[in-house]
Regions:
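Short secondary-structure subsegments characteristic of cysteine-rich extracellular domains
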Residues: 83-87, 94-96
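Short, solvent-exposed beta-strand edge segments and adjacent coil->beta transition regions
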Residues: 7-11, 56, 89-93, 130
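Zn2+-dependent peptidoglycan hydrolase active-site motif and core
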Residues: 80
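Short, structured motif recognition centered on aromatic/hydrophobic residues
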Residues: 9, 16, 26, 61, ...
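Core segments of cupin and vicinal oxygen chelate
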Residues: 15-65, 103, 110, 123-128, ...
Length: 152
């Protein structure tokens, strides 16, 4: 026994370089609702992150069954030239079930996301038979789209 119980997921967070574009992706393309957008206290966030006096703005968005947190550090001064690749240690993504893979890929491209590889059909595991693809944005998001289960 661990002495505590996980009661559910609270959110998935992404650090992004362009908060407005990331909001547009989740709100305008995916239909998520913006719950809050506000700067955070630099002293408090510095204690949490060990980054001295970070200038940070956080947005929370609600989607179907899950909340997304977008974080923008305006003054960290240590931006990575490249975001993690989908196969790098520590890389993260959120996977979204979509009802039309072709339409989702096209709409995502219109919002500046690019295919990492190609759309493939999974051959094993819980998503067997479903089409999947990774997408990345220039502002720090990696999204996996998962198409509907095969008919029958």
């Amino acid at each position: 026994m661990t002495g505590f119980t996980v009661r559910g997921f609270n959110h998935t967070g992404f650090v992004v370089t362009d908060l407005d574009r990331a909001i547009g992706f989740f709100r305008d393309l995916l239909g998520f609702e913006v719950l809050s957008r506000a700067p955070r206290d630099p002293a408090l966030m510095g204690r949490m992150t060990r980054l001295p006096q970070p200038e940070l703005e956080i947005v929370h968005l609600q989607g179907p069954g899950h909340r997304i947190e977008l974080l923008h550090y305006a003054t960290n001064g240590i931006r990575n030239a490249d975001q993690p690749r989908v196969y790098d240690d520590g890389a993260a993504h959120v996977a979204l079930d979509v009802d039309d893979m072709d339409a989702a890929v096209a709409a995502s491209a219109a919002h500046g996301l690019e295919l990492v590889g190609e759309v493939v059909t999974i051959d094993a595991g819980p998503n067997r038979g479903r089409k999947v693809v990774y997408l990345q944005s220039a502002y720090g998001l990696t999204i996996e789209l998962i198409g509907p289960p095969p008919a029958g």
